[in-house]
Amino acid sequence: MKKPKPDPLTYSELRCAAVDLLSRRDHSRLELQRKLRPKAASAEDLDNLLNELAERRWQSDERFAESFVNSRVHRGHGPLRMQHELRSKGVGAA
């Protein structure tokens, strides 16, 4: 039996969900968009929230990329693999 689809989150609830995700680790804008889209009441709310997070510097693709690369270097991943993974997360190769 299928579970009923939950009601969309208000803007405030959506912000709390985003902050909860960002409190665990940095996320790219695209990652947040993919994770929050099913919960958002509208695409406009989600876009406004992502802009707000970037303006407040709570979310930064640059900071995400630096953290991501550092973690992958320690795992021994090569530059081509890291570039591919970054592109899949919505961050251009540096």
Listing of model-derived features with the role each one plays in the protein:
Residues 1-94:
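An alpha-helical, amphipathic repeat domain used for nucleic-acid recognition
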